[in-house]
Curated annotation (Swiss-Prot):
The lineage of its organism: Bacteria, Pseudomonadati, Pseudomonadota, Gammaproteobacteria, Pseudomonadales. Transmembrane segments: none annotated. It comes from Pseudomonas fluorescens (strain ATCC BAA-477 / NRRL B-23932 / Pf-5). It is an enzyme of class 6 (ligase). It is found in: Cytoplasm. One of its GO terms (molecular function) is UDP-N-acetylmuramoylalanine-D-glutamate ligase activity. ATP binds at G116, S117, N118, A119, K120, S121, T122. This is UDP-N-acetylmuramoylalanine--D-glutamate ligase. The gene is murD. Pfam families: Mur_ligase_C (PF02875), Mur_ligase_M (PF08245), MurD-like_N (PF21799).
Amino acid sequence: MSLIASDHFRIVVGLGKSGMSLVRFLASRGVAFAVADTRENPPELATLRRDYPQVEVRCGELDVDFLCRADELYVSPGLALATPALQAAAARGVKLSGDIELFARNAKAPIVAISGSNAKSTVTTLVGEMAAAAGKRVAVGGNLGTPALDLLSDDVELYVMELSSFQLETTDQLGAEVATVLNISEDHMDRYSGLPAYHLAKHRIFRGARQVVFNRQDALTRPLIGEGLPCWTFGLSKPDFKAFGLREEDGEKYLAFEFQNLMPVRELKIRGAHNQSNALAALALGHAVGLPFDAMLAALRTFAGLEHRCQWVRDLDGVAYYNDSKATNVGAALAAIEGLGADIEGKIVLIAGGDGKGADFKDLRGPVAANCRAVILMGRDSDQIGEAIGDAVPLIRVGSLQEAVEQCRATAQPGDVVLLSPACASFDMFKNYEDRGHQFVRIVEELA
């Protein structure tokens, strides 16, 4: 049964993908609601007017009096809760909520909840494939692919959800069967006052969780939990009790659980130490919800990774080209640089730059010095990255992605990797990170 009172009035704030899923959900349950968006022509406006012509919609500057007609506002993750109109409505007693809170109230099957600064999509997809291999009727989505409310179904046996900090801000009680924060590094500092505020938002994922998984090599991922709550860890160190990790025997490295070797690392199709960590995180989450190891390992052996996430493009003249356009923050770029750097004989020629979202790039310097032959810089905040790296390696500034790839080809030597891992968002030069990745792949594939 839907846990939503139908005699109250709601307003959906934000008419993008998640906003439209809220519209469909509320309409299907006969709830009275309206829609507001700060944009004059939001992405789903035509769809709303075609399918729900009776729904009142206000576009442009948010009207506080209009918002205060509602008992509850469902705020899309793209809109900051610090927006003055939202704060004014909250001060007058209007509840601020979101689609994930509504999803959690209505989901009947167990939820695997996954957040983190990086690798969320890879681990979410992997757990979904593990569940499918085990014969479960699984629904995968949230911040990845299908909006959460569109997944609700009585047929689903397990939900695997990727959740962003923005989605978690409006989620009071998720009540996941198992929850994890994979890693935490600076991201979205244009939306948060600092790392502590971002950390607090991420940790809302643990509210009401029945089990937790955390990264034992990243103290910021460890939740404050009560006694008796089942807890599993993952990391690249040797595992002990209730832990997943790496164990080496006779020169062979294995994914392992406690004191049991599960499979050789060389059987993974996904490259780099960061992807070994992702595999271990997925195993921990799957184990927590009772997935058998044979099904999980079968899924791991066939998983080739996701587009734009350390995606192999081609080998040319002894140089491998990788598209990691999804690396829109420093932590993601570091994972790729250090993960691939430990896995290759040569060096990395890195393409970096774009919209830095207020990040501090100083943490790039050491890993770049250790793993890179050169860095090709482009985009709005390329000078900030250049200042952070300093004289650690040669820096080459370019005006386009085409020029960046050409410089990489001229610089790289056999055994090297050319890596697009920008450490920045893409909106200064591209439609989105997918557009940036697709252009990179096209340019690389056109190299003679």
